Amino acid sequence: MSDLHFDPMADPKLVDRLSSAEPKEWPDIFESSDNKTPARYGADSNWALLRSALWQTKQTLPNPAFLVLPGDFLAHNFRRQFDAAAANHSDAAYRQFVHKTMQFLALQLERTFPDTAILPALGNDDSYCGNYQLQPQGPFLADTLPIFRALVGALASLGFDRNWMSYGNYSVTVRGPRMIFPNTVFFSANYHNGCGSAADADPGSATLAWLETELAAAERAQQRVWLVYHIPPGVDLFTTLLRGSCPDAIVPMWKQTYAEPFYALTRRYSDTIVASFAGHIHMDDFRLLGGDNGYYGFVPITPALSPIYGQNPAFRTVTSDAAGGILDQTTYELAYLREAVDGAPPTWQAEYTFTQAWQLPRIDLASLTQLYAMITDAPSDRDRWHTFLPVSSPVYWSTNLGEAALRGALAYRCADGHMLLPEYGRCYCGGGG
């Protein structure tokens, strides 16, 4: 489950009561709201949607080996919404409210899966400072340390506190692979240490150095690795689409200062890294790592719970073998969201299972390379992928992208197979391929 983007201000009348209450009291306050329907398209997750998703996840998979959340726990524009709704919107009151929100989310996850390790990554909205402004060694990391350490539980490795407090990085070893969580928010082209100092160490370079140490240790121990992070590499195709001009407006997800050494590092350890997992773009998608000279890795991208960009809310289950290989995955969607918000109960259903939908044996580099060829060359496969991308939402392409929707499918498809900017430009600006 990714990109929860939980909005406790969805009913602004409740904010002052929430501010003065303990997080364990929040469910009763939310239940007092007149609005008990799940968040609509164009809005972040409210309590009704979060509660429904957690309940359905538990029904679908009662005893998972672990639960992975690739970031963005907090709603978009969190500070602006808080200031508009709260009587006291001082910096101290805001920090306390954000802290309580993180505590509340952790409490709901723990109550739903009391015997399961819960493994979170941080997203770009998870900060006191603002979007893409997490302060290294700052108060948000300090305040969330006990929350996240409790979620990770006994899997927390030696050095967990130090690594989290520094940059929000950590690693754990589960049944099968070692899981490494580098904070790729620091790699983002949008990142700015707005609450820090010019004298602070570069968090992106520090995270790359830490990741290299972790991968080297895994290789020595002959461990297979899953990487889990929020922002995937490659092209920021949503921004690229909205800018319109081609090829000058192609926007990368990461600064090249970090992207190039990351690519070199993951290529060097490609025999150790089984897969990477990301979120951020809210879509059900994937990325192939490499380029025209060959691929060496892949990144399944988990769709969002939040329907703010017009996708159907979703979560995903993954099955793996003892070595960390991915056998299959199933995406679950909140279907008929339009009807649900008009009073009918929300209906969760399995949208598709990878091996059944694509007739591919498992999720690995060979299968995803073949899938990319299928959606490039076969119109029927491309149409199916086009449906799955926004989790079968009937409104995403027309409502969210407007005129850019005409180029949207090509932009997304080129991003799946072309991570490097020149290659993406040739694909997108040249009409595909």
Q: Model features per residue range: what roles?
A:
Residues D91-E110, P139-R162, V251-F262:
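Acidic, His- and aromatic-enriched active-site or binding-groove loops in soluble protein domains
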